[in-house]
Amino acid sequence: MNSIITPQQVIDLIFIPETLVTQSKITATDIAIAESRYLLPIIGEALYDAISAGLYTELRDEYVAPMVAAWTRYIAEPLLAERLGIAQDKDYSEADNDVRKDAVRRLRRNAQLLSRRMSDYLNAHSDNFAEYNPADNPLNHCTIDGGIVQIF
C-alpha cells in the first residue's frame, strides 16, 4: 500500500522543529495504520487511489495530509518514548504519566478535529470529487461529541 504522505512529511506537518523526532522514529506502519483506520473509512478506496495517483493535490495537501499526520502522531506518541530511548512508565512519577496521558488525549482531539474539517470540506465540495460518496462517510451518520453519541 502506497501512503499518501511520508514519515518526513508527518514530522514536518505535526511536530515542532525542536523535537527529537526524526524520520526513522515515524514508521511506514504508523502511517498505514492511520490511513487504514481513520482515512479510508471517510474517503473510500476510490478517492484514496485517486489521491495516491496524484489527483486532487489541493485536497491532499490542505486536508488529507494534515489529518493523516495528526492521526499518525496519535498512534506513534505512546511508542515514541520507547523509540527515543526515554525512560519507561515505571521510571516516571504518577504526575508525569498523567501529563503524558493528557497529551495523548489532546492529540486525539486535534486529529478528530482535522478529520471533521476534511469531511466537511469533502461534503461541501463533493461535486468536485467523483470518487467520493458522502453516504459512505461514517462521520455523516454518527459522531461522538463530548462523550455523547449522535446518530443522524
Can you describe what each PLM-predicted range is?
Residues K90-L107:
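Short His/Asp/Glu-rich catalytic/ion-coordination signatures at enzyme active sites or charged loops
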Residues M1-A65, L79, R83-A87, D91-A95, ...:
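Conserved short "hinge" loops at termini or chain/domain junctions
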Residues R109-A111:
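Long, hydrophobic, well-ordered secondary-structure blocks that form the structural core
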